[in-house]
Amino acid sequence: MKIKDLKKGKFFKPHLGKYEGQWVPPTWQKIEYDRKKRGWICYEVEGKRIAYFYPQEEIKEVYL
């Protein structure tokens, strides 16, 4: 999964720095994020936990 895969959908996450304003699938549920724009955001996507790490722009599946 790449950053470009996060473009479609209706759930809006406005706190990703240069990705501010980007739309992601509405099935993604925000779990947590770092207000200083460093750290990660974790989503649950169709039963899988996906983490977006920033500012290094890495996305990977995680198990929480």
What is the predicted function of each stretch?
Residues 6-8, 34-38:
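A short, compositionally biased
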Residues 21-35:
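Short beta-strand-centered aromatic/proline hotspots
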Residues 12, 28, 40-42, 59:
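Hydrophobic beta-strand residues in large extracellular and virion-surface proteins
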Residues 46-64:
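Intrinsically disordered, low-complexity, charged/polar segments
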Residues 1-11:
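Mixed-charge, Lys/Arg-rich low-complexity intrinsically disordered regions
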Residues 15-17:
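Short, surface-exposed secondary-structure boundary micro-motifs
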Residues 36-46:
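Short, solvent-exposed secondary-structure boundary/capping segments
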